[in-house]
Amino acid sequence: LFREETGFPLWEYRRIFAQSNYQTPVTTGDITLMNWPQNDYFLGNVYDVSSQEKEKHLYQAKQLSLSLFYWLQTEAPRPDGGKGYPGLKLRPDVLGTKNGLAKAAYIRESRRIKAEYTIVEQDVSPDFNEAGTGKFYDDRVGIGSYSIDLHPSMAGRTYLDIKALPFHIPLGALIPKDMDNLLAGCKNIGTTHITNGCYR
């Protein structure tokens, strides 16, 4: 959980405020966002289902996040042999909600457009690009750098993290086929399931 412990420091991974960056004492403490594989909810869909089914899954997703948070407060093993970090607390003041959870569920993978160009793994993989960057697009409109990060799925496939090179964002991936006057953005651009893991 933390840098002084073994493993990957999840606390720092999504930290949005580090008290150590300020000379003046700050009483809020560090602030991190809990968007980790441990609170990924994949027991149902919120698209193409009834309103009742959607609300059920959104509720259960909140319960999963609250359960993980409770475990962190009360049972997470500490380096000193103790259990839990009772000083952790939800921050309604930061997120603008009554319960301290996000205002909306994070949908990790949305529907994607059928784009004029679809970015494939070979475009970003070091196995197919020798220049130290991903494929060079003449119509590039942006840049990015993130590994291909796929979380567990409803089919039970486990977490996957594959190295990807720094990459460009081609305009063709933002333009849908067969539709005028629309540009896609974020996780619905022309990617595959694999490359969607790094284009965010």
Where are these regions (language model features)?
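Flavin (FAD/FMN)-binding glycine-rich loop and adjacent Rossmann-like elements that form
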Residues: 1-198
